[in-house]
UniProtKB/Swiss-Prot annotation:
<dbReference type="GO" id="GO:0005829">
    <property type="term" value="C:cytosol"/>
</dbReference>
<feature type="compositionally biased region" description="Polar residues">
    <location>
        <begin position="517"/>
        <end position="552"/>
    </location>
</feature>
<feature type="compositionally biased region" description="Basic and acidic residues">
    <location>
        <begin position="950"/>
        <end position="962"/>
    </location>
</feature>
<feature type="short sequence motif" description="LXXLL motif 8">
    <location>
        <begin position="820"/>
        <end position="824"/>
    </location>
</feature>
<feature type="modified residue" description="Phosphoserine">
    <location>
        <position position="488"/>
    </location>
</feature>
<keyword id="KW-0804">Transcription</keyword>
<feature type="cross-link" description="Glycyl lysine isopeptide (Lys-Gly) (interchain with G-Cter in SUMO2); alternate">
    <location>
        <position position="932"/>
    </location>
</feature>
<feature type="cross-link" description="Glycyl lysine isopeptide (Lys-Gly) (interchain with G-Cter in SUMO2)">
    <location>
        <position position="170"/>
    </location>
</feature>
<feature type="modified residue" description="Phosphoserine">
    <location>
        <position position="218"/>
    </location>
</feature>
<dbReference type="InterPro" id="IPR031408">
    <property type="entry name" value="NRIP1_RD4"/>
</dbReference>
<feature type="short sequence motif" description="LXXLL motif 7">
    <location>
        <begin position="714"/>
        <end position="718"/>
    </location>
</feature>
<comment type="subunit">
    <text>Interacts with CTBP1, CTBP2, ERS1, HDAC1, HDAC2, HDAC5, HDAC6, NR2C2, NR3C1, NR3C2, YWHAH, JUN and FOS. Found in a complex with both NR3C1 and YWHAH. Interacts with NR2C1 (sumoylated form and via the ligand-binding domain); the interaction results in promoting the repressor activity of NR2C1. Interacts with RARA and RXRB homodimers and RARA/RXRB heterodimers in the presence of ligand. Interacts with HDAC1 and HDAC3 via its N-terminal domain. Interacts with ZNF366. Interacts with RORA.</text>
</comment>
<keyword id="KW-1017">Isopeptide bond</keyword>
<feature type="cross-link" description="Glycyl lysine isopeptide (Lys-Gly) (interchain with G-Cter in SUMO2)">
    <location>
        <position position="509"/>
    </location>
</feature>
<dbReference type="InterPro" id="IPR031405">
    <property type="entry name" value="NRIP1_RD1"/>
</dbReference>
<dbReference type="InterPro" id="IPR031406">
    <property type="entry name" value="NRIP1_RD2"/>
</dbReference>
<feature type="region of interest" description="Repression domain 2">
    <location>
        <begin position="411"/>
        <end position="701"/>
    </location>
</feature>
Amino acid sequence: MTHGEELGSDVHQDSIVLTYLEGLLMHQAAGGSGTAINKKSAGHKEEDQNFNLSGSAFPSCQSNGPTVSTQTYQGSGMLHLKKARLLQSSEDWNAAKRKRLSDSIVNLNVKKEALLAGMVDSVPKGKQDSTLLASLLQSFSSRLQTVALSQQIRQSLKEQGYALSHESLKVEKDLRCYGVASSHLKTLLKKSKTKDQKSGPTLPDVTPNLIRDSFVESSHPAVGQSGTKVMSEPLSCAARLQAVASMVEKRASPAASPKPSVACSQLALLLSSEAHLQQYSREHALKTQNAHQVASERLAAMARLQENGQKDVGSSQLSKGVSGHLNGQARALPASKLVANKNNAATFQSPMGVVPSSPKNTSYKNSLERNNLKQAANNSLLLHLLKSQTIPTPMNGHSQNERASSFESSTPTTIDEYSDNNPSFTDDSSGDESSYSNCVPIDLSCKHRIEKPEAERPVSLENLTQSLLNTWDPKIPGVDIKEDQDTSTNSKLNSHQKVTLLQLLLGHKSEETVERNASPQDIHSDGTKFSPQNYTRTSVIESPSTNRTTPVSTPPLYTASQAESPINLSQHSLVIKWNSPPYACSTPASKLTNTAPSHLMDLTKGKESQAEKPAPSEGAQNSATFSASKLLQNLAQCGLQSSGPGEEQRPCKQLLSGNPDKPLGLIDRLNSPLLSNKTNAAEESKAFSSQPAGPEPGLPGCEIENLLERRTVLQLLLGNSSKGKNEKKEKTPARDEAPQEHSERAANEQILMVKIKSEPCDDFQTHNTNLPLNHDAKSAPFLGVTPAIHRSTAALPVSEDFKSEPASPQDFSFSKNGLLSRLLRQNQESYPADEQDKSHRNSELPTLESKNICMVPKKRKLYTEPLENPFKKMKNTAVDTANHHSGPEVLYGSLLHQEELKFSRNELDYKYPAGHSSASDGDHRSWARESKSFNVLKQLLLSENCVRDLSPHRSDSVPDTKKKGHKNNAPGSKPEFGISSLNGLMYSSPQPGSCVTDHRTFSYPGMVKTPLSPPFPEHLGCVGSRPEPGLLNGCSVPGEKGPIKWVIADMDKNEYEKDSPRLTKTNPILYYMLQKGGGNSVTTQETQDKDIWREPASAESLSQVTVKEELLPAAETKASFFNLRSPYNSHMGNNASRPHSTNGEVYGLLGNALTIKKESE
């Protein structure tokens, strides 16, 4: 067996197998320290090497492993003794395997085959294990290094040569009899000397320098390190095989101490995770250090600057940032914050006030801080923050550094800094922090201003300083590094959450960072929509005009107002404009952007919820995920109290207009760093101009501080999921409180829907979205789904059953086509006219009832409905055409039902667009599963609230997509207040993206105008035949759109979903959380329906969602924008459900978007 030959695929396979076997043996040992693992692996590798060198490597391996242990025992006696024990335990465990391996000792390849067949039968692909083991060996090689031992082994091997391999086998057999570690070590020393002498020359032949270096470096590191090196070599494969065989034999041997194997298994587990975590740890360690440095500096500088720099925020803080380099960054950050605060006042007076000071602080402080703060602050702040955030530091540090660097680079120079952002988090961190603080302090000051203008700032700033000291780290990165903000806030505010929620969130955010990259706008919309939800959500709906105007000039503000549908519309274009470039600039920027919106959203959410229920927010913060759901419910209730009546919210809209601007301004500021300081200044000025009205009518400064703190904590605890939940739950109680309003609004919305129908793009697109969702499951079933939806009004339980029935999106299409289709057909046949009447009635009076009762079934029914034959759906649609409510109700039940269903459908579309296309749905789902596996921490974080929904949605992808359809519709419904304007912006903007459903308005021209509808000509004909049920026609169009939308609508719907999350700001997360939980799906449905009710313009919402859907193609054209939306969708509840239930789109589409985004970056 020539080692050179083994260097090829065989060597690689062998190394993989050996790695797997080593890991298997280690785990079989049921224990062992990391040292033990390395001992095992090192022993295995060394033994394998010896085995390669000597035909009978098992004895040699066994003795070699112990020999290494014995020789290393000379160097590190305990380690080698443990290694010997570990090898013995491996003998005990794998005596039979070792015998089998020893049978194939002569033929290393045969032996390798035996190992593969026997020990590695289940792991032919040991690449992962081998990589992990290699990383483990590498990580522990330094620990195990015994240069003298390795040299001795090599010398002995060279001296004795290969002849002792068989003797070593005998000796190893004798060692089995020895049973004593000492005798084993002695005999193994002799054997290993002989083996090493034998394998030494062979190893030098193959890789004399490599093996010698490995052995010289450390006998067992040589075993582990050279094993690692040899892992890529045939020698390592054979030696490792022998070592594995010896491990098996030794585990079977009597004198085995399980502890080493336990340590090895533990190390294997730790290092396997460590292999992944080390990347994060190494990357995030620097990032965390930088982030913590900046955060500590910020906290310190915030305290100083808030006290000292409040009066001289713009100039003195600039000078402070310039003068104090180490403090300069902290100061620059708080100075930027204070400057932002002052500039908030100045922004009210002169928008440019913020821009000049903020850019100055950003650029100048970036240079100074990067030069000085980095070094000094990196040490002290890093140590301090690392100490404070020891557990979450690797993950949180990564996110925080990422955010800090992203923000730093994004604020001074969105593109350049973004470019520097990833490569130099430490360097960018300080600058990022300063520019970051520029925007975020503005945010904080904006919130303060909203609550208290300049007069209150000192108190609010002091309180805010205290709160920021607790929450500033996340808040400062909150602008661009909201994700890290959440993490940082979690780590700082919630140490226990740091370990659990922070790590999960960091893992969750790590993958969601990409998702959020595409979803910061949605997050912003979520945040804006959520935080104003008490007073601003309606306001945002009303302020869409203001926000719409502001977003144009200030994309961040626009993104902020994006929470509301109207802003969303403009935001799509603007987000594409400015979010896309920052995202294109760098993924960290996108992550930061996503983080910032989510952070703001969380902050606004926390503020909103804290205004209503500060204690619940605190509880949610403490209770992390579980509390997140309950807290979100509490927050939803609080939001209900504040924004319970959707109609009330509308009247409040104008009053809240300032408030929405305030959250928008905050969001804008947070996002503005992504754009630029100028944009930030403009947004700030706009936000400030809008915010002064908001803060005074809003909460007092201290209250806002508390709310901000709690919001930050909530954000950290719940992440965006809790945001969605909070808003969604808020909206759910709000809908409950204002069901009559919703019913009235439903009538109004029906009118609005008709209006939007006049806009072919929106309703048509929304319906197309819904239909493509269903169409993805099955175009024909979706056509039947319209009747199914129609029936869902009549047969709500059936829809529930349908929803639960579809286990998987694919199964959904088939199973629904079969059983569900039959049930729906039966229901359709039995309830065609009744459903129309019932739908109409539900839309009128039963609307609330339908909302509450049928809401979930409808939503589920919508899930099921796609299974319905398109013909049946066409039939139902045609039947419903006569009745406007009935028409939409076929798809949605009554219009109110329709709203519910829309909301649910928005949910479904929201989720389903991700799993929108059947083919891409599977792919996306597979991607979602991959990302799910990849995002274990995220899933762990989301598992409680979201996994429940995700698993049903994953299993019931079509129901999920239907939910998403509902969700998407609901998000559209949600921003109903501003949905028409949003639709105007949205579908006009997305029209270029997807002309088919561009104007998928409730106007039947939209139905006629169905570039996507051609996939369902008959369905389109059905739609055309019933132009009155614009929603239904829209849905039919989505079905027709489905085939096209799978191509375009997939992205389109992804964006649409993203928009839906924006529309349903936090509702998507709530959907995500609720849909993740099977029991929550009803709540989700209710909340979705309530969202629809809350924003009765369900048709509008559909239109808006459709427009967003339409925008998706445009977003595809604008990859970064789409990426924004796509990650945002993933990030939002829909993001959560989407990476899981609609991962296909979120990840398939999002993957494309992320790929595009990365490419753009």
